[in-house]
C-alpha cells in the first residue's frame, strides 16, 4: 500500500492545491509538529499527499499521481466549476480516465476504477 506521496510547489500555490485535492475527496490533516513549517498534508482513505513548499519546485514533465474517483464526470465538473484544468482521456482496462493539472503544474490522472491487479 502506498502511504504517501510528496510533491513540491511554491507556497503561493498551496491554498489552491488544498482546494484541488479537497475536490478529489482528500481532507487536510495536521503534520507532526516538526513538519508544520513548509509542509501541508492531505489524506484520503489512508493515503496522504504531502505538499512540500519550495521556492524552486521540481515538476517532472511526465510523472503523475493517479486518483480513483467514484464519479468521474461529477469530479470533472467540480474541477471545471472551480477553475481547474481537466480533460477526458482514453479508456483503459474498461474504465474511463481523465487528466487534470494540479496547482504547481503537477499532472493528476483521474480514474473511474483502478486497473486489475494483474495489469
Provide a role label for each language-model segment.
Residues 1-18, 63-65, 114-119:
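N-terminal beta-strand motif that seeds the catalytic metal site of vicinal oxygen chelate
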Residues 8, 66-70, 101:
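Short hydrophobic/aromatic beta-strand micro-patches
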Residues 8-48:
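Core segments of cupin and vicinal oxygen chelate
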Residues 19-23, 78, 104:
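Structural preference for long, well-ordered alpha-helical segments within the folded cores
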Residues 34-38, 59, 92-96:
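Short acidic/glycine-enriched loop/turn segments that link adjacent beta-strands
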Residues 39, 48, 66, 97-99:
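Short hydrophobic/aromatic beta-strand element in the GNAT-like acyltransferase core
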Residues 62-84:
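Mid-chain, well-packed structural core segment of small domains
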Residues 82-119:
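Vicinal oxygen chelate
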Amino acid at each position: 500500500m502506498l502511504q504517501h506521496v510528496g510533491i513540491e510547489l511554491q507556497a503561493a500555490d498551496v491554498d489552491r492545491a488544498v482546494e484541488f485535492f479537497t475536490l478529489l475527496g482528500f481532507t487536510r490533516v495536521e503534520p507532526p509538529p516538526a513538519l508544520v513549517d513548509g509542509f501541508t498534508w492531505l489524506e484520503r482513505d489512508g493515503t496522504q499527499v504531502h505538499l512540500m513548499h519550495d521556492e524552486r519546485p521540481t515538476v517532472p514533465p511526465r510523472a503523475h499521481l493517479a486518483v480513483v474517483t467514484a464519479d468521474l464526470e461529477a469530479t470533472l465538473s467540480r474541477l471545471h466549476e472551480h477553475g481547474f484544468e481537466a480533460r477526458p482521456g482514453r479508456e483503459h482496462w474498461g474504465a474511463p480516465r481523465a487528466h487534470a493539472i494540479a496547482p504547481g503544474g503537477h499532472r493528476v490522472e483521474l480514474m473511474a476504477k483502478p486497473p486489475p491487479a494483474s495489469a
